[in-house]
């Protein structure tokens, strides 16, 4: 019986690629970086960012060096990122519709995200989905991060469910899918352009609303 569905945030619920591109374009305009071609600023930022796995203080330090940015420090640019990125947070299609449908089935919702607590919470609130979740675990606050099995078990404990009663949805084949599978959970891989496949996934989806059909299929196995 499926009693809980837990999610990753970036690349799963939050369309980070689109959100980041919107933010970078806005930052380029707001901070009057017109001496740098906007396409160059965007492409170098995205390359240095490495899908979010490089923190922005390092990204900005490198941008300042490479693009000869003057009158702005890395810390000033980072502060701008922390303040303005949430304003550009864009969900994947059918996010809220999917969450509402799951909640209507009396299934608990959880989120497990790697990152800095305040920044991630700002992004979750920007998507206006925080009220749907029964528990949200962010690695900085928890002191552990995915793929550590403990953060998954902690999330399940907070929801009062066992691994066999839960599904984890994520975009990273190792940190999300393989790790959740090792914790004993069913897994759904949110397909993306960063990774070609996720061998440990029980299911794969391109649209979030496909998760509803998977929940129904899992219910059918219980009969």
Q: What are the residue ranges of the model-derived segments?
A:
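N-terminal helical cap/lid subdomain that shapes the substrate entry/recognition surface
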Residues: 2-93
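Short, acidic loop-to-helix structural element flanking the phosphoryl-transfer center
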Residues: 83-110, 149
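Residue-level marker of alpha-helix boundaries and capping positions
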Residues: 51, 89, 111, 167-168
